[in-house]
Structures are given as C-alpha cells and as structure tokens.
C-alpha cells in the first residue's frame, strides 16, 4: 500500500502555500532570550462509525465555532460544558484542513534549527492513527509533513543557497515500558539518555537518511507493520503501543563562519486510554492496557506539575514522559491534536480527553535555535619538517654551510620580536596536528584583513634571528644566576661567627640540601636585616638546635649495577629543657583551666575527648601533671604520648616567638 496515492494535487497546493517569505530562516535571535511558546491544542471530532447509530442518537458534542465546542453536562442535562481551544475540527473536516490549519505552520521552525512535535491524543477508537497516518486516499499528518519537509529541504539546498540541508528519520514504539526500534526490531530495549545541554536522545536508535518521499516510504511502510496492534471489543485494530516518528533536519552553512543547525520533528501517535470493563481485555491485552493507562496517567501528572509550577516535574516516571520532555515544558514548538468520538458510550472518555487538552494549553515551552560552529570547517595544511622543529632541533639539523652563512640584515630583530619569543617557544613543542589548524586559522584571518602577527609565516632568516635572541637571553639569565650565588656567598661569609667565640657558644649546624624537614630553607637573595633582628635570631638559636647525630646507611639504586650503600647524615631537633618545661606548664594550665572549646584547639583533642576531660576535672579536680590524662576513661597511654608530641613543640615555639 502506498502513501502517495491521490496526493499529488494536494502536494502541489501545500508546496505553493509554503513558498515565499514565510519560509525564510531567521537571522537573529542567537543572542536574545528564547521567546515563550505555548502548547497549541486542537480538537478533532470524528464522525459516527455507522449510519444506524447516527440515526438513533444525537452526538454528545456540538460545535459552536471554529475554536469552541460544547458537551452535554451529565450532572445537569439542561446545561452544557463549553470548551475553547486554538482550533476545532468537526466531523466533516478533512485531513487537508487539519494539516494546513495546525501542523504546517510549525515546519518552518525546523529550518531555523528549532524542534517541533505533533501529538495525537484521545481514547481508543477515536481516530488518532487515522489523523496521523490516514489512508492512500486521505493521507494524514505524517505523509503530508514529510512531503512538505523534503520539498523545503530541496529548495533550501538548491545551488546558490547558503545552506546544505539533509533529512534523516528514526521510528520507534514504547511497548509495555520498553523502547523498541521499529526499523531494527532485533535491537531490543533501548535506553533514553539526556546530554549536557538537556536534549533527549536514544543511543543505538537506527537512523535512515532520506532524500525523497520514495525513500521515506521504503523505510516507513515495513516498519509500520512491526508496530504492536490488537483487537478489542471497541476497536478491531487498536494500537497497543505509543509510536514516535523522529525526523532530523541537519543544516550546514557553505560559507564562513560554517555554522551548523539541527532541528528535530517528533510525530507521535499515542495509544488510547482504555476501560477494561468495556474492552474485555484479558491476559496480554490486560497487561498492555495497564502499561498504556499508567503512562497516560503520568502524562497527566506532568501537565499538572507544569501548570502548578512545581519544582519537580515527574518526567522520569515513565518512558513516554521522558521522551516527551522536550515537547512538554521543553524547547519544542508543540501541537496537541485531541481526537474525540461523538457516541454517548464514549462520553466519559470524551470529557477526560477534553479536560486533559484544556490543561495542556497552559503549558509553556521555550524554543531556541540549536546552532554551533563546525570545528573541522578549515582544510588542514601540512608543514615542512624544518618548520615543525624546535630551536634546539633546528640548530642540530642545519648543515655547516647554513650555520656559517649570514648577513648584516639577519642580526637585526624586528620591532615585535619580544612579542613573538614566548609564542615561538610554545609553538616549537606543540602537536603537529594543532599546528596545522593554527596555520589554517591564521591564513583565514589574513584573508579577512586581520592584523595579527604571522608567527608561522615568518621567513626562515627572521626565525633564526629570533631563536638566536632567545639563546642570548638564556645565557644572560645564567650569568645573573652566577652573580647572585656570589652575592649570597659574600653575605654568608659576613654573617659567620668569630672563631674566638666558638668555644663559648653552641655550634649550629646547617642541614644539607637533601634534608627535607620542617626547618625553613634559606633565602636565595641577599637581605640586609636590622641589628635587633639578628640578635634575636642568635638568642633563639640557644633554645632550639639542629644537631648532627651521625652517619646513617641507606641503600640507593644504581643505573649501572645493583643497589649501593650510601652514608647520609642523621639530624635531630634538640630543644632546651627550660623551653620544654615552660611548654609543659602552659599545656597543664590549659588542661586545668581551659573550656571545652579551648581544649578542642589542641592537636588530637576532639569534641568527645574535650567533654571527657572537662567532666573528669569536675569530678576529681585539676590535673597534677599532663600524664594524668591516662586516668580519663577513653584516653590511653599511647594517646597521651602522641598528644604530648603534637602539642609541646607548638606551644613552646609559640611562647618563644611571642613578645617578651
């Protein structure tokens, strides 16, 4: 069965309706805030299924105008319930009217890099699948939208136009909370993901490129036969799953700045809600009906949460709402077509569908343009081997004739040499592929009139001059370092103590360069200090000393042979007894008089131990010595020993460095 039969006149009519200024791609809006777009809703009333029912009873729905309808109130028969929507299509409306009035206007947003979605909603047997698919004589929304979209893509990709447009399709169904690929039924259950920008995607979903309507039919018709359908009391071909046709429109700009746009069109045929008491579902049909009703119930919860402005929207409660996250409250231009039946036996289903549709029109979406720049738009340019070599490698690669050659002009660096030096040093060790991209970008900027420094295009002789300047600066830095070391040696010689005073003062040994202790390293520049500060340092050296204890053997690996033993000096910090006694007294005073907060400032004392110390002190009085902490329940002797090591030196040093 072909979807194209008897549609050629309508196709020409739609193509002429979409041509003109209304189809132009929007040039602005990239830097502005995305405008708000309300979900547009339309209601379609199908005719009676047979003439006998139409002759026996009146319809429970009556049209008021092209946007309003009224339904009999089952509570009060003398009153009616009135509803107003964006569009209302009566039982005599055609597929062409529904498509042109509600669906066709949103197709232009796809060429602007925005998303759009069309949802068919309603109870079972209300005509949703007929609205979306139709028949060969009356094609529905899906074939009409694909014909127009492919026509727009061909016009936009014509020779001389700035954009190259491609179209691809995917087709899936949600059956019993499983996402199944209708183009590849053997792929199994797929997962729904969300990227860093909040876009919903399905990894592993088959994507088929299409260039004509024949390509679309070739993929779509066999895939439609894979959709789950079944017979119930109310519908002989009831859809047992939600079907989603995803059409992706990619646009690539042919000229600079080589922008790329991506628009997606979701065409969704929802399964209808069912009352199992009337459908007589049993077994697998009952299980399918439960999954359908659950997903539609979550869909209603999502709409209510969006209307109430709740902080959490339950998109993840079902696969359907997760997939529709972009269509409801997301970034898509959405159209909801609610299908209802005129028979009185469908009255409750009709009221439920109309109430859901009325709530859905309050949902606000925020469409935006999905636009990016192509990172690989520039053609790579290969560099020669000499251009990729750094300064040292270039010098080694030069022959003796090249080294000896030179001219007076080559010794003069350009005025902007200081700006090029650091950049050339970075470029010399850069990845070759990145260098190719940089060179391509530089040539592009040069063609646009850029005044940047052409580092990679500098002549060979000028680059040699710059490298020579870099080497001269490195030699000058080495000379400055040697001069600094000489100045440091002179300062240390002036500060050396008199040999006659050596017998009366303790020797202070400097640790070797390999010693990694807590002693601060000497400054590497000459500093003139006042006499009072030097005197304080000499007095402090009598309190804390770093003594050499003797050689200590250490095994070190050798590159030529096995491990070799090496003697290293062993150092030990020695503190004067007076300073230790003062620190111990200060620590004991803090244990006896400090509050719990002050005790927590000590090392190895937390909230629990501080409370234990305060409680023990209240029961037994003050501590006579610091070692009495062992008597506190929960504090062992090892903990007291580590407590002393952690706090004695810091308290003594703080007291010693404080004001006298």
Curated annotation (Swiss-Prot):
There is a cross-link at residue 460 (Glycyl lysine isopeptide (Lys-Gly) (interchain with G-Cter in SUMO2)). Residues 405-418 have a biased composition (Low complexity). ATP binds at residues 122-129. The keyword Nucleus applies. SUPFAM superfamilies: P-loop containing nucleoside triphosphate hydrolases, RuvA domain 2-like. Residues 460-505 form a coiled coil. The modification Phosphoserine is found at residues 407, 422, 447, 540, 576. It comes from the Eukaryota. It is found in: Nucleus; Cytoplasm, Cytoskeleton. One of its GO terms (molecular function) is DNA binding. Residues 505-516 have a biased composition (Polar residues). InterPro entries: Hlx-hairpin-Hlx_DNA-bd_motif, Kinesin-like_fam, Kinesin_motor_CS, Kinesin_motor_dom, Kinesin_motor_dom_sf, P-loop_NTPase, RuvA_2-like. Residues 38-363 form the Kinesin motor domain. Its main location: nucleus. CDD domains: KISc_KID_like (cd01376). GO terms for cellular component: chromatin; cytosol; microtubule; mitotic spindle; nuclear speck; spindle. Keywords: ATP-binding, Coiled coil, Cytoplasm, Cytoskeleton, DNA-binding, Isopeptide bond, Microtubule, Motor protein, Nucleotide-binding, Nucleus, Phosphoprotein, Ubl conjugation. Residues 1-31, 391-418, 493-516, 534-567 are annotated as: Disordered. Transmembrane segments: none annotated. Ubiquitinated; mediated by SIAH1 and leading to its subsequent proteasomal degradation. Kinesin family member that is involved in spindle formation and the movements of chromosomes during mitosis and meiosis. Binds to microtubules and to DNA. Plays a role in congression of laterally attached chromosomes in NDC80-depleted cells. Belongs to the TRAFAC class myosin-kinesin ATPase superfamily. Kinesin family. PANTHER family: CHROMOSOME-ASSOCIATED KINESIN KIF4A-RELATED (PTHR47969), KINESIN-LIKE PROTEIN (PTHR47969:SF9). Interacts with FAM83D and SIAH1. This is Kinesin-like protein KIF22. It comes from Mus musculus. The gene is Kif22.
């Amino acid at each position: 069965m072909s979807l194209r039969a008897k549609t050629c006149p309508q196709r020409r009519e739609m193509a002429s309706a979409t041509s003109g200024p209304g189809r132009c791609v929007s040039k602005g809006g990239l830097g502005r805030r995305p405008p708000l777009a309300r979900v547009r809703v339309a209601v379609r009333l199908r005719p009676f299924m047979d003439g006998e029912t139409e002759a026996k009873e009146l319809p429970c729905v009556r049209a008021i105008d092209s946007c309003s309808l009224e339904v009999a109130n089952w509570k009060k028969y003398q009153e009616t319930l009135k509803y107003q929507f964006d569009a209302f299509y009566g039982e005599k409306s055609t597929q062409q009217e529904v498509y042109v009035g509600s669906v066709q206007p949103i197709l232009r947003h796809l060429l602007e890099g925005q998303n759009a979605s069309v949802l068919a909603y309603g109870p079972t047997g209300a005509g949703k699948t007929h609205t979306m698919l139709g028949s060969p004589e009356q094609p529905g929304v899906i074939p009409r939208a694909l014909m127009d979209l492919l026509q727009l893509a061909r016009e936009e990709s014509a020779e001389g136009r700035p954009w190259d447009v491609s179209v691809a399709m995917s087709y899936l169904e949600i059956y019993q909370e499983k996402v199944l690929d209708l183009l590849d039924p053997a792929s199994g259950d797929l997962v729904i993901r969300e990227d860093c920008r909040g876009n919903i995607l399905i990894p592993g979903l088959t994507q088929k490129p299409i260039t004509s309507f024949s390509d679309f039919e070739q993929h779509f018709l066999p895939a439609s036969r894979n959709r789950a359908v079944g017979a119930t009391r109310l519908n002989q071909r009831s859809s047992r799953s939600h079907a989603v046709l995803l059409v992706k429109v990619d646009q690539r700009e042919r000229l600079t700045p080589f922008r790329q746009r991506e628009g997606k069109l979701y065409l969704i045929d929802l399964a209808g809600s069912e009352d199992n008491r009337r459908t007589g579902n049993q077994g697998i049909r009952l299980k399918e009906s439960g999954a359908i009703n659950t997903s539609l119930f979550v869909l209603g919860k999502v709409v209510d949460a969006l209307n109430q402005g709740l902080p959490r929207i339950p998109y993840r409660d079902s696969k359907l709402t997760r997939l529709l996250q972009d269509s409801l409250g997301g970034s898509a231009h959405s159209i909801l077509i609610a299908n209802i039946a005129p028979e009185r036996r469908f009255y409750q289903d009709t009221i439920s569908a109309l109430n859901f549709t009325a709530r859905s029109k309050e949902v606000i979406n925020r469409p935006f343009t999905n636009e990016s720049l192509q990172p690989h738009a520039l053609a790579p340019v290969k560099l020669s081997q000499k251009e990729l070599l750094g300064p040292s490698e270039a010098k080694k690669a030069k022959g003796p004739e090249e080294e000896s050659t030179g001219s007076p002009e080559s010794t003069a660096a350009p005025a902007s040499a200081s700006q090029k030096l650091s950049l050339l040093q970075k470029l010399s060790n850069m990845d070759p592929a990145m260098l190719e991209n940089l060179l391509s970008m530089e040539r592009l900027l040069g063609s646009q009139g850029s005044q940047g420094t052409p580092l990679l295009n500098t002549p060979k002789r000028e680059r040699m001059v710059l490298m020579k300047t870099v080497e001269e600066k490195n030699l000058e830095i080495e000379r400055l370092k040697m001069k600094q070391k000489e100045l440091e040696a002179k300062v240390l010689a002036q500060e050396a103590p008199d040999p006659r005073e050596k017998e009366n003062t303790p020797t202070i040994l400097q640790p070797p360069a390999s010693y990694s202790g807590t002693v601060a390293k000497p400054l590497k520049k000459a500093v003139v200090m006042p006499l009072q500060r030097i005197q304080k340092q000499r007095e402090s050296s009598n309190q804390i000393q770093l003594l050499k204890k003797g050689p200590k053997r250490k095994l070190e690996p050798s590159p030529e042979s096995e491990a070799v033993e090496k003697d290293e000096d062993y150092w030990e910090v020695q503190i004067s007894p007076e300073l230790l006694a003062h620190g111990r007294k200060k620590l004991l005073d803090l244990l006896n008089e400090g509050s719990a907060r002050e005790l927590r400032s000590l090392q190895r004392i937390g909230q629990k131990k501080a409370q234990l110390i305060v409680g023990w002190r209240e029961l037994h009085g003050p501590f006579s010595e610091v070692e009495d902490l062992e008597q506190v329940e929960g504090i062992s002797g090892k903990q007291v020993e580590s407590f002393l090591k952690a706090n004695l030196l810091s308290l003594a040093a703080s007291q010693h460095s404080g004001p006298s």
